[in-house]
Curated annotation (Swiss-Prot):
Entries under InterPro entries matching the protein: Ribosomal_uL6-like, Ribosomal_uL6-like_a/b-dom_sf, Ribosomal_uL6_a/b-dom, Ribosomal_uL6_arc, Ribosomal_uL6_CS2
Key word rRNA-binding present: yes
UniProt keyword annotation of Metal-binding present: no
Gene Ontology BP term (one): cytoplasmic translation
Subunit organization: Part of the 50S ribosomal subunit.
Keywords linked to the UniProt accession: Ribonucleoprotein, Ribosomal protein, RNA-binding, rRNA-binding
NCBIfam families xref list: PRK05518.1, uL6_arch
GO cellular component annotations of the record: cytosolic large ribosomal subunit
Superkingdom, taxonomy of origin: Archaea
Family: Belongs to the universal ribosomal protein uL6 family.
Function: This protein binds to the 23S rRNA, and is important in its secondary structure. It is located near the subunit interface in the base of the L7/L12 stalk, and near the tRNA binding site of the peptidyltransferase center.
Name listed for the protein in its UniProt record: Large ribosomal subunit protein uL6
C-alpha cells in the first residue's frame, strides 16, 4: 500500500489563548488556566505553531506516514483541541446518585469524595479527586468541573467505580453513582 507523503492536521487557536511548543511539549494558556502535556511518546510527529493571514493555528504533521502514524496525527490534534477547549470554557461531568432503599449521602472532604450508607454499609467508600478538579454535590447530583478533560473524566470514573457492586445482580441492585452527562461549560 502506498504511503502518504505529508499527513497533517490543523487546530485553530482562538483569541485570548497562547500556545507554546517546545519540542514535543505543548503548553496552552487561556482565561481559565494553563495546561501542559508531553507528546514525546508520539514518535515521528512534529508539532508547531503557524500563523496564516493573522490567524494562529497548531500544525501537527508527519512525513511518509503509515496507518498508525496517520492515526497518531489526528489523536495528537484532538488532544490539543481538548486542551484549548479546557482553558477557554472548561469541562463538566454530571453524575446521578441512585438508590432504592438505603439513602446514599455523598460528601467532599479535601481531595476525596466519601460515600456514606451505600447499600447500608457502615464504613464509607472513598473516591480520589484529582488535582485541578472541583466536585460539588447538589441534592442527588454530583457535578465535576475542571480544565483538563482527562482529570475530570478520571475523577468521575473513580466515583463511579467506588460504588460498583459485586456479587449482586446489577439489574436488581441499581444503587450507585452514574455519569449521565458530559459537556463543555459555557
Amino acid at each position: 500500500m502506498a504511503k502518504a507523503v505529508w499527513v497533517h492536521a490543523l487546530v485553530d487557536v482562538p483569541e485570548g489563548v497562547e500556545v507554546e511548543v517546545e519540542g514535543s511539549k505543548v503548553k496552552v494558556r487561556g482565561p481559565k488556566g494553563e495546561l501542559e502535556r508531553d507528546f514525546s511518546h508520539a514518535k515521528g510527529i512534529r508539532i508547531r505553531v503557524v500563523e496564516e493571514e493573522g490567524k494562529k493555528q497548531v500544525l501537527v504533521e508527519t512525513f511518509f506516514a503509515n496507518r498508525k502514524r496517520k492515526a497518531l496525527v489526528n489523536t495528537v490534534a484532538a488532544h490539543i483541541k481538548n486542551m484549548i477547549t479546557g482553558v477557554t470554557k472548561g469541562w463538566r461531568y454530571k453524575m446521578k446518585i441512585v438508590f432504592s432503599h438505603f439513602p446514599i449521602s455523598v460528601k467532599v472532604v479535601g481531595d476525596r469524595v466519601e460515600i456514606h450508607n451505600f447499600i447500608g454499609e457502615k464504613a464509607p467508600r472513598v473516591a480520589k479527586v484529582l488535582p485541578g478538579v472541583t466536585v460539588k454535590v447538589q441534592g442527588r447530583d454530583v457535578i465535576i468541573e475542571g480544565t483538563d478533560i482527562e482529570k475530570v473524566a478520571q475523577t468521575a470514573a473513580n466515583i463511579e467505580q467506588a460504588t460498583k457492586i459485586t456479587e449482586f445482580d446489577r439489574r436488581v441492585f441499581m444503587d450507585g453513582i452514574y455519569i449521565y452527562a458530559r459537556e463543555v461549560m459555557s
